[in-house]
Structures are given as structure tokens and as C-alpha cells.
């Protein structure tokens, strides 16, 4: 691959308390878009490019900790998929460690929906691709992967968010789906694998189940009764206490079993 070292492997309160999720979601897939974008579903072989961006550079220890969190998130997703009879393999690549990807004033998400959603497309020229669509086509034509995504992570505090694709978006700019992650939350508590898995699920088509600027408090209350451990409702430092429940499983392609009332949780 161009300018990348590829490696393969099958890879907010106090510690061990349940966290109220501090993330925002931009462009979570609507029902008609469940199998759209570069990461159409949680199944098959999925290529994950992790881009380590920074204002000053990454230390080896920082990169190792973040890589371990990403692998823990991936391993959990593989296990959850198997609960629904699906086999998933993640194929990983990294950028930004051997040759730093430096930016001035990396901003945080804010939870109100006006975060920049073009970060993936802006990053691609630094890796030798004119845009995200060209990269996604390269993966499709040169690997046996069924989908791909980009995890952008900055070594600073921030509020993570996802950049999922919708049919109305410009393919060159937005078809390649990605997330913006940080090594710690805004309050300074370290990030965790569950938050990463949550954002990855958004790219596969999942919706937030907690109240946001587009999800209702009524739906959050209902989700707490129906799906109390779902990864899209809350996250925990102990990801083993979490699950992909049946609504999220349907949205991300793990099952075709669907109840009509699932639609009540979907937002535009």
C-alpha cells in the first residue's frame, strides 16, 4: 500500500463503573442506508486503517496503549458477531507512526452535530490518495476485504464522533467512513475499548440509544429497559459487561430478524 506499513492480526466516572457516553454521531445510517458506505456491515473481512495524528508526535508508549484498546474493541466485536453466527476478521494497517501526521490545533467533538465531517478525505492526500473513494477502491481491488474504515486518533483529550456515509453525500469526500477518536475524554479520564467499539458500530449502521441532539430522551428511557447493556446506550471500562443487543444487531447486519417497533429508535 502507498506510504503505509501494513500488519495483520485477528486482533464518565471511575474505573470499572459504567460510563455515560460522551460521544456524538454524524451521519448514522438510516434504515435505507444500512448496507451503504465503505463499512456496510459487521461481517466478513474488514480493513481498518488507524491514523495516529498529533500536534507534537506520538510516544511509543502512547501508541502501544491506543493500539491495545483498538485490538480489544475489535476482539469484542468478533466475539459479539459470533453470538449471531457471523464470522468477522479485522485486517489492520497503521499510518502516522513512522512518518508523523502533524496538525495544528486538533479540535474536539462537541456533541451538537457541527463537528467537521471531512477529516478522512482531508487526510487521504497525506497518504498518497486523492480522496477517500480512491482509497476505498484500492482496498476493494487489491485485497479480499469486504469493507474498510479509517480510525483517526489524536493523543489529546476530546469527545469522539463518527463520520458515517449517507446516500446523499459526495462519494469522493464521504464514501470512506471513519471515526475521530482521542486518547482521553474531555474530563481527562482515559479512553476505553468500549468507546472505540461504539464508534465503529456507527460506521456499520448503528444508532445512538442514549439521548443526543437527534435521539430522544423517551427512546433512551425505553432503551434502558429493553437494551440495558447495549454498546450504543452506554460504555464501560469493562467491555465484557456490554453486548450488541438485537436492535443494534439488526442495524449492523448481524441478523435479518426485525421488529416493526425498532423503527421508533431510528432518527434522520
Predicted feature descriptions by range:
Residues 3-14:
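Bacterial N-terminal signal peptides that target proteins for export
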Residues 24-28:
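Sec/Tat signal peptide C-region and signal peptidase I cleavage site
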Residues 29-145:
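Propeptide-to-catalytic entry region of secreted or membrane-anchored zinc metalloproteases
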Residues 178-196:
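Short pre-active-site segment immediately N-terminal to the catalytic Zn-binding motif
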Residues 194-209:
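Active-site recognition of the HExxH zinc-binding catalytic motif
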Amino acid at each position: 500500500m502507498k506510504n503505509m506499513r501494513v500488519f495483520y492480526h485477528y486482533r464518565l466516572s471511575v474505573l470499572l463503573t459504567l460510563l455515560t457516553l460522551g460521544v456524538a454521531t454524524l451521519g448514522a445510517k438510516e434504515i435505507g442506508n444500512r448496507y451503504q458506505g465503505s463499512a456496510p456491515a459487521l461481517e466478513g473481512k474488514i480493513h481498518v486503517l488507524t491514523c495516529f495524528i498529533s500536534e507534537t508526535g506520538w510516544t511509543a508508549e502512547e501508541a502501544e496503549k491506543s493500539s491495545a484498546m483498538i485490538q480489544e474493541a475489535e476482539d469484542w466485536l468478533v466475539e459479539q458477531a459470533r453470538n449471531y453466527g457471523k464470522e468477522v476478521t479485522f485486517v489492520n494497517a497503521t499510518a502516522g507512526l513512522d512518518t508523523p501526521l502533524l496538525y495544528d490545533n486538533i479540535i474536539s467533538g462537541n456533541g451538537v452535530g457541527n463537528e467537521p465531517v471531512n477529516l478522512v478525505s482531508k487526510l487521504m492526500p497525506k497518504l498518497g490518495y486523492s480522496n477517500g473513494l480512491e482509497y476505498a477502491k484500492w482496498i476493494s481491488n487489491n485485497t479480499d476485504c469486504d469493507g474498510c474504515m479509517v480510525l483517526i486518533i489524536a493523543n489529546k483529550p476530546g469527545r469522539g464522533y463518527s463520520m458515517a456515509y449517507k446516500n446523499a453525500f459526495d462519494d469522493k469526500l464521504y464514501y470512506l467512513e471513519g471515526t475521530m477518536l482521542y486518547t482521553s475524554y474531555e474530563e481527562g479520564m482515559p479512553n476505553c475499548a468500549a468507546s472505540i467499539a461504539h464508534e465503529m458500530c456507527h460506521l456499520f449502521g448503528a444508532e445512538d440509544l442514549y439521548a443526543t441532539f437527534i435521539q430522544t430522551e423517551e427512546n433512551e428511557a425505553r432503551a434502558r429497559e429493553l437494551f440495558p447493556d447495549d454498546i450504543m446506550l452506554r460504555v464501560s471500562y469493562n467491555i465484557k459487561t456490554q453486548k450488541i443487543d438485537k436492535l443494534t444487531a439488526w442495524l449492523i447486519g448481524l441478523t435479518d430478524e426485525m421488529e416493526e417497533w425498532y423503527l421508533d429508535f431510528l432518527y434522520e
